[in-house]
Amino acid sequence: MDKYDKIIDLTKRRGFLWNSFEIYGGIAGFFDYGPLGAILKNNVINTWRKHYIVNEGFYEIDSPTVTPYEVLKASGHVENFTDPLVECKSCLESFRADHIIEENVDVDTEGKTLQELQEMIEKNNIKCPKCGGEFKEVSTFNLMFATSIGPGGKRAAFMRPETAQGIFIQFKRISQFFRNKLPFGAVQIGKAYRNEISPRQGVIRLREFTQAEGEFFIDSRKKENFEKFESVKEIVLPLLSGKNQENESLSAEEKIVRMSLSDAVKNGIIAHEAIAYYIAVTKKFLMEIGIDESKLRFRQHLPNEMAHYAADCWDAELYTDRYGWIECVGIADRTNYDLLAHMKNSSEDLSVFVELDEDKEIEVYEIELNYKLVGRTFKGDSKVLEESLKELDDKKMEELVEALETEGKYVLSTCKRDFELLKEYLTAKKVKKTVKGEKIIPHVIEPSYGIDRITYCVMEHAFKEDEDRTVMGFSNAVSPIKVGVFPLVNKEGMPEIAMDLKNKLRENGLIAEYDDSGAIGRRYMRMDEVGTPFCVTIDGETLTDSSVTIRERDSREQFRIPINEVVPYIKDKLN
């Protein structure tokens, strides 16, 4: 058994992870969290909440997982959320084209076109691993689970592929909550769905998974000189830049460069201070939940693998024994792509008014309608036209004026109808105006976390074996059971004292487990295996001097303290 198999065996035995639908044969891409796994995962999430909600001042929302078609059409997911698919001509089994190539040839398929993938399959004579048959042509497969809303299937929808869109859709409400003052951030934690073609990587590649995403809305002019960056600029991180990835003269080790965030921004490796800051926040979070720092790196996306919405993106990748480096966090500059897309498709104004440092004199177009002609032509819709003209930005106004001058007409599209405007319907003249602010479409920095992958890596990085025990060396922040409480023997009042102590620990918010079965050494081993950092034993001395033995998991050190000091001692150590 390799390390992965040992961990999966332990997690199944001890109630961390179980195959979903197991009594019906199971389905690839789905896992259940058992009692200890659910606590572990929630501890990871709550630590994440501490970093983003408590420390960073974001607020959390909770939106539906079923998402109307038009939302994901506007966001680009209907067109772009795809993977390359190959299907066997003989057995009709489907596979990810890029994965099947990498399993047979030592080559990186990241960013390759469908044609390039097809050529690789043909050149290397790659066959179906199930039956040895030939593959059909490589095609694209949309990863979203399709569904419908209501009877009759009239309202097309999808299970959401990411939690982020719920935040963008509610941007106006969120902005009002923050009194329309940039910058501000919102987070959402919940299920997302991707209909993976052939998930064969256990808990690493799931069809239903938990995301924790933050959307930080900021004036694009503030990204370069981000106020909070000063506090993290000297943090040194292992960076794998896009430039180094493409430099074939460098070895794999040479491509990763350790440098401060300050130098990375200064040298143009990281786009700006705002994205660098959230890379630092990500590192702090991963360290607190027990990720091995030597198994962490930050890799920049290459241009040909960048998401359709991103201007720059860095992945926090964690090393695993079986699967190598896996992407667990993406920190992306989504620019104003999403807000612009939803503005265009919903006709809602998703801009924010920002005050200028000083008053500014600008030239703007002033529109004067020929109300007689407009009223005769558009009748009851004249008011809609007037309001729509007021909402036009400078670029659209320039476009309108130029079209009327050169072509004599212009079609203005609104959410209610299209207006075909003729030159005689209005006059537009430039006037000077003093303004105290302006409307902008905020840019978005998005830290997006795959909670399930992170939780698995927490388990793998915590897993240790020696001659006589297996240990899950969880950090205090995430360990599911905080204290094991044991009576040395089941007599002389020791069980009653132990049970009373367990109840006091629980009353103080600590999950404590009572165990009176087997030799004390076996009980320690059971607690080590599930990552419990402290064990307390009630023994003969407890009956005479009210002291107990505390045993620490990692050092195995044992010492005595008064029983009435156990709760404050452990709370202090855990914090």
Curated annotation (Swiss-Prot):
Substrate binds at residues 96, 162, 209-213, 446-450. SUPFAM superfamilies: Class II aaRS ABD-related, Class II aaRS and biotin synthetases. It is found in: Cytoplasm. ATP binds at residues 194-196, 204-209, 327-328, 450-453. One of its GO terms (biological process) is glycyl-tRNA aminoacylation. The keyword Cell wall biogenesis/degradation does not apply. The keyword Lipid metabolism does not apply. One of its GO terms (molecular function) is glycine-tRNA ligase activity. Keywords: Aminoacyl-tRNA synthetase, ATP-binding, Cytoplasm, Ligase, Nucleotide-binding, Protein biosynthesis. Its EC number is 6.1.1.14. It catalyses: tRNA(Gly) + glycine + ATP = glycyl-tRNA(Gly) + AMP + diphosphate. One of its GO terms (cellular component) is cytoplasm. Belongs to the class-II aminoacyl-tRNA synthetase family. Catalyzes the attachment of glycine to tRNA(Gly). This is Glycine--tRNA ligase. It comes from Methanococcus maripaludis (strain C5 / ATCC BAA-1333). The lineage of its organism: Archaea, Methanobacteriati, Methanobacteriota, Methanomada group, Methanococci.
